[in-house]
């Protein structure tokens, strides 16, 4: 991973971590100064139409303050922005809302507007401040005062152009420092920054948890660049109230006071105080009503207090209320009520209500004041003061002010313990206001239970009456621990209305359980309002654990009972457990359990009713059980177990586990017991914006891969979108069901950044077979994971039960890559990470990395890629046993990757890395194949460890319809005798898809990449064949690339790569990459043919050797001596009737192209041009036959080949070559004579002789790289041979013999054949035991084409001195038609006294020689030579062409080549290469020009390489008259120039 990616991940992680901290404990303030209503607003300069500055987060956070400050206003409570630019119309000037604008600047109701939208307008529309609302940045600061404790959601409905909102100290601004310069925090609560013309962020909102009574710093920064400006701001309070635009009563300002030390409150939750107050009120009812409310008030000391207000309303009737106050040692006031009947002194019986108030024995006095108000809820506040009583003593007095609203009945049950032996129940009636603001008649049922060991069970039943009835029964039940328990059954009969019962459990410090009931209205997930009965159960804060078990039954209502038992957790510790059994009707509803964190110390459970539509399209009534758990350090683990009952049971246990990071964690285990029916449990993970994990369950019916319908239970786990990563680990175990648990740990990813990771451990039964993971894309915004069961048949023919884990990933999150890692565990673990990578096309892509950790004890891991008709990539795993190439059986884990056949080709790239395992990932790119058609390509990148030795790729055919890639490890002994661990990548390709060709290309990467492309070629039989091209890209920095071909008995071609170090003739060691191609010993032959119709010959003969340079189509020379000396057959360049064939003495024959992407190149015409009025550019490209010459050079230098002649060529390079095509080439030639030893062989008898030879040296400079070439050419015509001192190469040549050949001559499209004697020259080359024989037929006399003569000016240069002479010359012309493009090739050859012989001394081209041509007309002569030669096992048909043209124009500079090399990625046209001069020796001038009338669309694809050709033209001039072999060399020369 690149460093920018590391920094990007670190920034994202830090931002998310800060967001998480902020959401958990937002810093608040308690400024002591004078409070002022509203916010302060500062205005700053912003440039009109600046479309980039406001897109910078740093500018929006603090950078704006560096601009010019225009002014400020204060006391603003209406803080939303809605600015409309003016429309100047015929009827006047009016503001035009943006939604009313139309067309080319018109406004509804006003008509066309004559003014411009893109200029600055001045007005006071922004908070009364005169500025340019069209282009301005403003900052709003103030303190937000929350009236309630809970989550506040701030929202921007839209943004035009850019805005942010921050809440909290050290985020918006520091406490008591509102007017200070802005701080640099970019931890925005709302990030509404959007680029110019871009779309808005998806959810322009943010949530902050705040505590009532504290002041929270709040800052809004807004920028507008041009025209309209819009920023609507709203906030939703914890009770659901939404405040929009006008924030009066919520936002305030304070003057700065940097000296106030207690201004900052880092975590307000640590400062909250809880008190309980009791208020007694008279009323006109006939009974006493008691209600309880929770509120938070801020006292005169500025400290907020959580307050429980118990309101007791007593009747003012003839009954008597007696209040008894008793002191006690507790710290709160307790109030209880009793009912009795007394007989007064008048003998009349009176019902008497005794209110016993127990007050703390402190000196404080509690005064309660009740006031009415117009709100919909009851407000309670507490103040502390000191009063002086009538006895003159001061007393601390607590004044409780209760404000009640001036406004259906609810049954509230209060349970109290007492010392009697029976249960007493009384009922009272009152009216309370619920959380929805509606008044409710409330029936208070006071249940006094004995303080014995009995358990109170509450059962709720519906009935047809309009009130709630409560009765009590006593029974004895046996719990799950086998112990009998006295149980008090409280039967509550409630009216059969459409209400929903929600149970909330709260802890308290008493020794009994209290149950109360309230009525409210909630809106479910289906948007429908539901009346909800809230049953509040207060349980003692003992060490017991509350377990809720839902059970179905046949009644029409929900019953709740409680049992006591003792269970032993997974940590072996016994736990007292309270089992709350909820019996629900057996209707079609589905129970969903949602777990939410909250700041309390107990677990609360509530229930809601809603209707959802499952994945099968059917609506389902759903009961949502909301479990609120304390936000402590414990982790909630959900375990699913089957059982034999007919309902789902949920229980909770506490245990302590040690995570993978070695830290102990308190863990809450939620055990969900599901019926052992035919349903399947599927777990789906969804992200959401909350801070806790929610789990719900749905029922649906799916059709598995077996075609059978299955009832499926979908468990939806919603996880917070924090910086943590959800990792799913699958483990086998010996149980019969699947268990899912969650752990928290911290891991360090491949980018070096630590990440909090949620590990979801899925334990599956080991009897259910293998586990396969399938990844599917979908349109959702989160990753969903489900599980299916199926039966598959492995490669060994055995059926296997397979658990398919289907991971659905969002298609908007980028690519999905699968990485396989070994580990020491005994099971396969799958986790998911998010990263951003840059593909080969330079485009960054969000990538989901699926890391599959497989056990290292299960053998090797092979990856098989299969196409299928699906639209996503599926990954599954199978187990099999294979026998490797060393004969040893190996357990193999086969990872089958099924890719969609509509996504294009699949290529496999192997990269080394420093890891200890093999990683496989997938990327998407666009490539252009050899047929010129762009194809979407899926690149499978296999990263293998560099410590495991070499990586070889073996290609095997098979009968499958897809390409399979697997990996084996073996140990081989290289050519240097050293054993090497080799990773063999076996690629099995289908035999029905045609031929398989391997192309080797150099590149700048540091590893070898292997990819596969599909193309269609037409063979010599005229039949099209589908061809699979395996492109192997090898690094150019690793030294030379050598290809060695070996026969073997296999039925396919295997390609492997070895590394070796060789010492060249220059004494320098060179790293060499040896590509070993093993070909089957069957009769595989390759025939080459020309790719166009042009057949061109020339009547010039020569006998001098020529050096032929080679460049691949991408401009980098990569052919080493080993490559050139391999058994390779390709076509020759010639312009004379020369027949050349190669026969390999063994049964192995193969065809290899030296070009990067063309494995079938056989004819490559070249062209060069020169002009009479200006210097011209010259390009050449070609492919020649392999030959038996010796070439050595230093590492990374260009490599050249010569013709098949007895010569020795050496090359040295002064520096490393560049990787691109050389823009210019300079050639220098010098000569000297020396004596050489020539070895001649005939009939396997060899002799040596001494012969004088011309030593010719030439240098070529390509992009600053200079290479020197030395050639020894024997002067005499006596045939000699030389045996080289090499370990792998040996060159011999036999004496010549003569024969008669048939020559085809063509002129004006009319061809004739003539018989001519020819010299037969044969030579053999033995390379690594493979012998190749080369035979050349050179006609002794040739039929020359019709010639015309003209005068040419020949410039001769020697030793830097040039002279010009006029000489008659023979004009020889030829035409070639390639893809309907006709090219005329003229040659001017100056006449000499002896046409058949020229001086044996080569011209020295130490300077630049320019040849000016004066001829104005061209005639066309065409001579064709076609020879078919049968040589034993191999048949080669060679048709050779060369191209030369002339013209007296200088504007056009064109080089053409056949389209077989037109797909190079580094093609450079002549018109782009600069001024490369065409240099020739005296005696030969060539010129080429494409006809000016030729359309550009008809041009043939070409590849060019700039090289000055003066040496080669001069050499050809020196070889015009000679023996047979010289024809071959001269022909090559003319083809090049």
Curated annotation (Swiss-Prot):
Signal peptide (residue range): 1-24
PROSITE patterns: PA14
Glycosylation sites: 135, 187, 262, 329, 374, 419, 464, 509, 554, 599, 644, 689, 734, 1114
Any GO molecular function: D-mannose binding
Annotated stretches, region: Sugar recognition: 197-240
Ranges where the record places region 2 X 20 AA approximate tandem repeats, Ser/Thr-rich: 1118-1157
Biotechnological exploitation: For many industrial applications in which the yeast S.cerevisiae is used, e.g. beer, wine and alcohol production, appropriate flocculation behavior is one of the most important characteristics of a good production strain. The ability of yeast cells to flocculate is of considerable importance, as it provides an effective, environment-friendly, simple and cost-free way to separate yeast cells from the fermentation product at the end of fermentation.
Positions of the propeptide removed during maturation: 1515-1537
Annotated stretches, region: Disordered: 770-799, 860-889, 995-1024, 1161-1232, 1392-1414, 1468-1497
Region of interest: 18 X 45 AA approximate tandem repeats, Thr-rich: 278-1087
Positions of the PA14 domain: 74-249
Region (3 X 9 AA approximate tandem repeats, Thr-rich): 1408-1434
Positions of Sequence repeats: 278-322, 323-367, 368-412, 413-457, 458-502, 503-547, 548-592, 593-637, 638-682, 683-727, 728-772, 773-817, 818-862, 863-907, 908-952, 953-997, 998-1042, 1043-1087, 1118-1137, 1138-1157, 1226-1276, 1291-1341, 1342-1392, 1408-1416, 1417-1425, 1426-1434
One CC-aspect GO term: fungal-type cell wall
Record field: compositional bias (Low complexity): 773-795, 863-885, 998-1020, 1161-1220, 1405-1414
Record membrane topology: Lipid-anchor; GPI-anchor
Pfam families: Flocculin (PF00624), PA14 (PF07691)
Compositional bias (Polar residues): 1222-1232, 1392-1404, 1472-1497
Keyword Membrane: yes
Keywords annotated in UniProt: Cell membrane, Cell wall, Glycoprotein, GPI-anchor, Lipoprotein, Membrane, Repeat, Secreted, Signal
Localization in the cell: Cell membrane; Secreted, Cell wall
Keyword DNA repair: no
Record-stated family: Belongs to the flocculin family.
Protein name: Flocculation protein FLO1
Organism: Saccharomyces cerevisiae (strain ATCC 204508 / S288c) (Baker's yeast)
Lineage: Eukaryota, Fungi, Dikarya, Ascomycota, Saccharomycotina
């Amino acid at each position: 991973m690149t460093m920018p990616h590391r920094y990007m991940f670190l920034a994202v992680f830090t931002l998310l971590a800060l967001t998480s901290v902020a959401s958990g404990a937002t810093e608040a303030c308690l400024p002591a100064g004078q409070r002022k209503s509203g916010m302060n607003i500062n205005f700053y300069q912003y440039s009109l139409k600046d479309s980039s500055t406001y897109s910078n987060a740093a500018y929006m956070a603090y950078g704006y303050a560096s601009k010019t400050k225009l002014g400020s206003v204060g006391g603003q409570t209406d803080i939303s922005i809605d600015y409309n630019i003016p429309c100047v119309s015929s009827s006047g000037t009016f503001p035009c809302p943006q939604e009313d604008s139309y067309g080319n600047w018109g406004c509804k109701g006003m008509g066309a507007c004559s003014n411009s939208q893109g200029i600055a307008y001045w007005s006071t529309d922004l908070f009364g401040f005169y500025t340019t609302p069209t282009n301005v940045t403003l900052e709003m600061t103030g303190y937000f005062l929350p009236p309630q404790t809970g989550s506040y959601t701030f929202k921007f409905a839209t943004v035009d152009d850019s805005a942010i909102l921050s809440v909290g100290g050290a985020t918006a601004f520091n406490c008591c420092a509102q007017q200070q310069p802005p701080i640099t925090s970019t931890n925005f609560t709302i990030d509404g920054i959007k680029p110019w013309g871009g779309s808005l962020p998806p959810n322009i909102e943010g949530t902050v948890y705040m505590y009532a009574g504290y002041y929270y710093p709040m800052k809004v920064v807004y920028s507008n660049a041009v025209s309209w400006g819009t920023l609507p701001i709203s906030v939703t309070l914890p009770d659901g109230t939404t405040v929009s635009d006008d924030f009066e009563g919520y936002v305030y300002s304070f003057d700065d006071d940097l000296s106030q030390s207690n201004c900052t409150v880092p975590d307000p939750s640590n400062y909250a105080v809880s008190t309980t107050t009791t208020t007694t009120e008279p009323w006109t009812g006939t009974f006493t009503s008691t209600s309880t409310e929770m509120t938070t008030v801020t006292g005169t000391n500025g400290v907020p207090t959580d307050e429980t207000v118990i309101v007791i309303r007593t009747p003012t009737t003839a009954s008597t209320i007696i209040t008894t106050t008793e002191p006690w040692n507790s710290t709160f006031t307790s109030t209880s009520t009793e009912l009795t009947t007394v007989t007064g002194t008048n003998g009349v019986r009176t019902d008497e209500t005794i209110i016993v108030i127990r007050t703390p024995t402190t000196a404080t006095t509690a005064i309660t004041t009740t006031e009415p108000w117009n709100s919909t809820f009851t407000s309670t506040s507490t103040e502390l003061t000191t009063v002086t009583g009538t006895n003159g003593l001061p007393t601390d007095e607590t004044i409780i002010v209760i404000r009640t609203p001036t406004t259906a009945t609810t049954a509230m049950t209060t349970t109290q313990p007492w010392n009697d032996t029976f249960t007493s129940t009384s009922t009272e009636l009152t009216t309370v206001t619920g959380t929805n603001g509606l008044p409710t008649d409330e029936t208070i049922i006071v249940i006094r239970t004995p303080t014995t060991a009995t358990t109170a069970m509450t059962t709720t039943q519906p009935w047809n009456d309009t009130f709630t009835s409560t009765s009590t029964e006593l029974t004895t039940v046996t719990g799950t621990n086998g112990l009998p328990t006295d149980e008090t059954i409280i039967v509550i009969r409630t009216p059969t209305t459409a209400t929903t019962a929600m149970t909330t459990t709260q802890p308290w410090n008493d020794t009994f359980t209290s149950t109360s009931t309230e009525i409210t209205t909630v809106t479910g997930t289906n948007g429908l309002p539901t009346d909800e009965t809230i049953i509040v159960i207060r349980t003692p804060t003992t060490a017991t654990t509350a377990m809720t078990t839902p059970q179905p039954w046949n009644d029409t209502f929900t019953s709740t009972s409680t049992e006591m038992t003792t269970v032993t957790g997974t940590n072996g510790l016994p736990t007292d457990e309270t089992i709350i059994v909820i019996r629900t009707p057996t209707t079609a509803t589905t129970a969903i359990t949602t777990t939410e964190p909250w700041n309390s110390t107990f677990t609360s459970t509530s229930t809601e009713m809603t209707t959802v539509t499952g994945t099968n399209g059917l609506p389902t009534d759903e009961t949502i059980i909301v479990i609120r758990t304390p936000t402590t350090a414990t982790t909630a683990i959900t375990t699913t177990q089957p059982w034999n009952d007919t309902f789902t049971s949920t229980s909770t246990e506490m245990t302590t586990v040690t995570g993978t990071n070695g830290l102990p964690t308190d863990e809450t285990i939620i055990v969900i017991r599901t019926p052992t029916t035919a349903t399947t449990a599927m777990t789906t993970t969804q992200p959401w914006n909350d801070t806790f994990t929610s789990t719900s369950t749905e029922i649906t019916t799916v059709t598995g891969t077996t075609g059978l319908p299955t009832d499926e239970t979908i468990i939806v786990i919603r996880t917070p979108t924090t910086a943590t990563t959800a990792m799913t680990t699958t483990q086998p175990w010996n149980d019969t069901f699947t268990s899912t648990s969650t752990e928290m740990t911290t891991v360090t990813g491949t980018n070096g950044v630590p990440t909090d990771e949620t590990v979801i451990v899925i334990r599956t039964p080991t009897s259910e077979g293998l586990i396969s993971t399938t990844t599917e894309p979908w349109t959702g915004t989160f990753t969903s994971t489900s599980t299916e069961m199926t039966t598959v048949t492995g490669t060994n023919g055995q059926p296997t039960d397979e658990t398919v884990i289907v991971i659905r990933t969002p298609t908007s999150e980028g690519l999905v890559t699968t990485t396989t890692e070994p580990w020491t565990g005994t099971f396969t673990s799958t986790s998911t990470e998010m990263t951003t990578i840059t593909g080969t096309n330079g485009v960054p892509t969000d990538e989901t990395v699926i890391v599959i950790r497989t056990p290292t004890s299960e053998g090797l891991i092979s990856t098989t890629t299969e196409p299928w008709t699906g639209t996503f990539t599926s990954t599954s795993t199978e187990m099999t046993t294979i026998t490797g190439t060393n004969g040893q059986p190996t357990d193999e884990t086969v990872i089958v990757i099924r890719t969609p056949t509509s996504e294009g080709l699949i290529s496999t790239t192997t990269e080394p890395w420093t890891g200890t395992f093999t990683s496989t990932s997938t990327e998407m790119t666009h490539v252009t194949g050899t047929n010129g058609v762009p194809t979407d390509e899926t690149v499978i990148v296999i990263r293998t460890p560099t410590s495991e030795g070499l990586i070889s790729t073996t290609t095997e055919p098979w009968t499958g319809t897809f390409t399979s890639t697997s990996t084996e490890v073996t140990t081989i002994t290289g050519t240097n005798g050293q054993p090497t661990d080799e990773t063999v990548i076996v690629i099995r390709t289908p035999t029905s898809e045609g031929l398989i060709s391997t192309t080797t290309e150099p590149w700048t990467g540091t590893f070898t990449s292997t990819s596969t492309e599909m193309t269609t070629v037409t063979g010599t039989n005229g039949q099209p064949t589908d061809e699979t091209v395996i492109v192997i890209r090898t690094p150019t920095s690793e030294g030379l690339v050598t290809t060695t071909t070996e026969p073997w008995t296999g039925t396919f071609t295997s390609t492997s790569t070895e590394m070796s170090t060789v010492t060249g003739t220059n004494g320098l060691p060179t790293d060499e990459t040896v590509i070993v191609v093993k070909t089957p010993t069957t009769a595989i032959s390759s025939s080459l043919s020309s790719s166009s119709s042009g057949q061109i010959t020339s009547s010039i003969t020569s006998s001098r050797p020529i050096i032929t340079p080679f460049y691949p189509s991408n401009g980098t020379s990569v052919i080493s001596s080993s490559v050139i000396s391999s058994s390779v057959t390709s076509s020759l360049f010639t312009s004379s009737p020369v027949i050349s064939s190669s026969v390999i003495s063994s049964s192995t024959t193969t065809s290899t192209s030296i070009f990067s992407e063309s494995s079938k190149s056989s004819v490559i015409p070249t062209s060069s041009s020169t002009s009479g009025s200006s210097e011209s550019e010259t390009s050449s490209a070609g492919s020649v036959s392999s030959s038996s010459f010796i070439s050595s050079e230093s590492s990374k230098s260009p490599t050249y080949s010569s013709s098949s002649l007895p010569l020795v060529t050496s090359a040295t390079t002064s520096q490393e070559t560049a990787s691109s095509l050389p823009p210019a080439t300079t050639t220098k030639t010098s000569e000297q004579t020396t004596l050489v030893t020539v070895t001649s062989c005939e009939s396997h008898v060899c002799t040596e002789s001494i012969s004088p030879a011309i030593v010719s040296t030439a240098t070529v400079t390509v992009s600053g790289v200079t290479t020197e070439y030395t050639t020894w050419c024997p002067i005499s015509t006596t045939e000699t041979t030389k045996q080289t001192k090499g370990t792998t190469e040996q060159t011999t040549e036999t004496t010549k013999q003569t024969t008669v050949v048939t020559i085809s001559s063509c002129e004006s499209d009319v061809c004739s054949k003539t018989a001519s004697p020819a010299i037969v020259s044969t030579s053999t080359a033995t390379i690594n035991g493979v012998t190749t024989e080369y035979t050349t037929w050179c006609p002794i006399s040739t039929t020359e084409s019709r010639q015309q003569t003209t005068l040419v000016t020949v410039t001769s240069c020697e030793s830097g001195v040039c002279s010009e002479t006029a000489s008659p010359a023979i004009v020889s012309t030829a035409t070639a038609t390639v893809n309907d493009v006709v090219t005329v090739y003229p040659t001017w050859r100056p006449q000499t006294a002896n046409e058949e012989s020229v001086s044996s001394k080569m011209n020295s081209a130490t300077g630049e020689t320019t040849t000016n041509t004066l001829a104005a007309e061209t005639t066309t002569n065409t001579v064709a030579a076609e020879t078919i030669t049968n040589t034993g096992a191999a048949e080669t048909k060679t048709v050779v062409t060369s191209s030369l043209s002339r013209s007296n124009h200088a504007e056009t500079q064109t080089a053409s080549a056949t389209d077989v090399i037109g797909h190079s990625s580094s093609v450079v046209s002549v018109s782009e290469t600069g001024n490369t001069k065409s240099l020739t020796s005296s005696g030969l001038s060539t010129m080429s020009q494409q006809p000016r009338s030729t359309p550009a669309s008809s041009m043939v694809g070409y590849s060019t390489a700039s090289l000055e050709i003066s040496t080669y033209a001069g050499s050809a001039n020196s070889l015009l008259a000679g023996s047979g072999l010289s024809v071959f060399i001269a022909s090559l020369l003319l083809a090049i120039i």
